Swiss-Prot record:
One protein family per Pfam: ABC_tran
UniProt entry tagged with the keyword Zinc-finger: no
UniProt protein name: Ribosome protection protein VmlR
Organism (species): Bacillus subtilis (strain 168)
Family designation: Belongs to the ABC transporter superfamily. ABCF family. ARE2 subfamily.
Effect of residue 237 to V: Still confers resistance to virginiamycin M, lincomycin and tiamycin
Knockout-associated phenotype: Hypersensitivity toward the antibiotics virginiamycin M and lincomycin, mildly increased sensitivity to erythromycin, clindamycin and oleandomycin. Hypersensitivity toward the antibiotics virginiamycin M, lincomycin and tiamulin, in this study has no effect on sensitivity to erythromycin, chloramphenicol or linezolid.
Region listing for C-terminal extension (CTE), in residue ranges: 483-547
Domain notes from UniProt: The antibiotic resistance domain (ARD) is packed between the 23S rRNA and the acceptor arm of the P-site tRNA and inserts into the peptidyltransferase center (PTC). The C-terminal extension (CTE) contacts the small ribosomal subunit, positioned in the Shine-Dalgarno-anti-Shine-Dalgarno cavity.
Transmembrane segments: none
Induction: Expressed during all growth phases; expression is higher during early log phase and decreases as growth continues. Expression is dramatically increased in the presence of antibiotics virginiamycin M and lincomycin. A monocistronic operon.
Gene: vmlR
Region feature Antibiotic resistance domain (ARD), mapped onto this chain: 183-289
Residues annotated as binding ATP 1: 37-44
Amino acid sequence: MKEIVTLTNVSYEVKDQTVFKHVNASVQQGDIIGIIGKNGAGKSTLLHLIHNDLAPAQGQILRKDIKLALVEQETAAYSFADQTPAEKKLLEKWHVPLRDFHQLSGGEKLKARLAKGLSEDADLLLLDEPTNHLDEKSLQFLIQQLKHYNGTVILVSHDRYFLDEAATKIWSLEDQTLIEFKGNYSGYMKFREKKRLTQQREYEKQQKMVERIEAQMNGLASWSEKAHAQSTKKEGFKEYHRVKAKRTDAQIKSKQKRLEKELEKAKAEPVTPEYTVRFSIDTTHKTGKRFLEVQNVTKAFGERTLFKNANFTIQHGEKVAIIGPNGSGKTTLLNIILGQETAEGSVWVSPSANIGYLTQEVFDLPLEQTPEELFENETFKARGHVQNLMRHLGFTAAQWTEPIKHMSMGERVKIKLMAYILEEKDVLILDEPTNHLDLPSREQLEETLSQYSGTLLAVSHDRYFLEKTTNSKLVISNNGIEKQLNDVPSERNEREELRLKLETERQEVLGKLSFMTPNDKGYKELDQAFNELTKRIKELDHQDKKD
């Protein structure tokens, strides 16, 4: 395949802090590359380097004569002016209303920007977190658009399902360098786990060898010491013991050289501990039974009705998912509950409720301030508690005095979450809380919220997240709001999970086959496995069509 971008020994620094170094990678025509890594690893930075918005500290990036387009994570402004026919068509398919950009929902804003990027007919399309805010239907549409895109795509994402479905190659930013893998996200994670196990075994084997040789050296040193002592004490045998001592010294030097050579040959490093994030949200506030009661609530913007005559009650301790298509009014409903927007009907909120509201916005923080200034504390103990929490959330010590504007989008979301962790809210209202968060942070947030004893209202399109954290849902559809208990996964959903598992296995087999020839040992078995997996996936697709 044709190589369109080459990165050679690329390094990047911010204020003398190394983001990544010695990055070597290539982009082939037709690739769909998923960039993964923890918050602050430099994923968005790498996109901007490829787009030529930034210059590397070292190394070079060679781009063939290609057209590039970049769709960023978030933007404060956008214009519907000068639309191309292709862009108009995508906006219609995605049902994006052509009105003031600031009046659009988070999902509608993203779809408008994606439509512009996809319609530019670029040779290389760069997408930064393209699934944030997207509902299930829009996500599936985007996956199909990318699979049939007549060009190359590099995307940053923390969405496990999306990476499995769309990516043909993974770039993982770990330990300040880049690892390339041919296959999807799940295939890479299996490969990574095997690699870490092999590395750990090699390191342990090397350490045993070092211990063995060092024990022999210590034994020889003891003999040498004894021989030297005897050479000065025993009359008549001094020369014999002196020669013996010298011979032992020579053996020690020989062993030392052998050890050094063995270490040079092996150079196995211990496995870097997994990046982890730890936090917990406590509530100590006593509350009554009801948190919220909504009666006959109707909300419309001009002639456009979002929902009408909505009635539901939420008890303290309930964990409720708010779901619906992009633009259906999920964020508007949250704002009505919080009294930030008006509506017809009655909304009662428990006056004793201590509410924390995490918005979708990442620009509403004081960007010039540092965490030290934002979480200003009078006592040394309180300041230490905040710094300890930051460390558990994956921040470095230097970021305590770093302006928030220099932080990644995911790190900004964590800063907002910190406020609610510190204030011990008994009601959390979260609007797309997993947007921008890296995978370890998402998983830890899921675990924390599943054990949270307070009331939770969450808007999210991350089905894994909602399955783990909520037990009921408010469904906004057909201008109404219906409260439902979380249902048991349907047979169709189980088929979809099986299909995804089979696709992951097929990608893993394909990755191995790509490094082999038909004459290699094991090729025939892998090729047979690939064909069998393909057959099973087609059978599942056929069943879906029948449904």
